[in-house]
From Swiss-Prot:
Function summary: Specifically catalyzes the dephosphorylation of 2-phosphoglycolate. Is involved in the dissimilation of the intracellular 2-phosphoglycolate formed during the DNA repair of 3'-phosphoglycolate ends, a major class of DNA lesions induced by oxidative stress.
Source species of the chain: Thiobacillus denitrificans (strain ATCC 25259 / T1)
Protein name: Phosphoglycolate phosphatase
Active-site annotation: 14
Lineage: Bacteria, Pseudomonadati, Pseudomonadota, Betaproteobacteria, Nitrosomonadales
Residues annotated for Mg(2+) binding in this entry: 14, 16, 177
Superkingdom of origin organism: Bacteria
InterPro entries on file: HAD-like_hydrolase_sf, HAD-like_sf, HAD-SF_hydro_IA, HAD_2, HAD_sf, PGP-like_dom2, PGPase_prok
Alphabetized Gene3D superfamilies for the sequence: HAD superfamily/HAD-like (3.40.50.1000), Putative phosphatase, domain 2 (1.10.150.240)
A biological-process GO annotation: carbohydrate metabolic process
């Protein structure tokens, strides 16, 4: 059991569902895609449960209505091209930081902690989204889903961040919202907090192997100290 405040040297934070409420823009792109395909679109609530494994998997879930099913390859090729076009045009139209995010980032910065954003979202969407919502400049390092050969739940992005920052895994805290985050953290040997408001396939984060559930990033900042 971890003791608090937790001594750390770096904090890395997930994007969708942790920093930003991106579901409205992700769902809007899905609606436009499905309209082009002449198909009905799932609800915003349903699409929110599909978020967290990158755009390709999101599109497959929207097409099939299942978490791990594979759609017809020709249909998927048409759908992913449509989705990427529409999402790229509206990546930060309705996406906003969750309550406490900016305050939390400011607190981490004031502590002198290294800060990174680690997401499974492709770089072509990650960077414009962070810039469009005013969060880009908080981070020394941004690792997207296609930056490295592997992404969360693989530990590689976290271990890469440790290497870049010159810290041990136990000194790097991951804050996320899903099973991907907790699995990556445990595999890397990092502590992990989760927020309860994100996109964990519709499941409560209390089911996950984590060190704390934090109501907001502002609350998370109160639970750490610089090592």
């Amino acid at each position: 059991m971890k003791s608090f405040p937790l001594p750390i040297k770096a904090v890395v934070i997930d994007l969708d569902g942790t920093l930003l409420n991106t579901a409205p823009d992700l769902a809007h792109a899905a609606e436009l895609m499905m309209a082009e395909l002449g198909r009905p679109c799932p609800s915003l609530e349903t699409i929110s449960t599909y978020i967290g494994n990158g755009v390709s998997r999101l599109v497959k879930r929207v097409l099939t209505g299942e978490m791990d099913a594979e759609p017809d390859p020709a249909l998927f090729a048409q759908a992913i091209a449509s989705y990427q076009k529409h999402y790229g045009e509206h990546v930060s139209l309705h996406s906003r930081p969750f309550d406490g995010v900016v305050e939390g980032l400011q607190a981490f910065k004031a502590m002198g902690l290294h800060m990174a954003c680690i997401t499974n979202k492709a770089e072509q969407f990650t960077v414009p989204l962070l810039k469009g919502t005013g969060l880009y400049d908080y981070f020394e390092l941004i690792l997207s889903g296609d930056t490295l050969p592997k992404r969360k739940p693989d530990p590689l992005p976290l271990l890469h961040a440790c290497e870049v920052f010159g810290v041990a895994p136990a000194e790097l805290l991951l804050i996320g919202d899903s099973l991907n985050d907790t699995q990556a953290a445990r595999a890397a040997g990092c502590p992990v907090f989760c927020v309860p408001y994100g996109y964990n396939r519709g499941r409560p984060v209390t089911e996950l192997d984590l060190d704390a559930v934090v109501p907001s990033l502002a609350e998370a900042a109160l639970m750490v100290t610089k090592a």
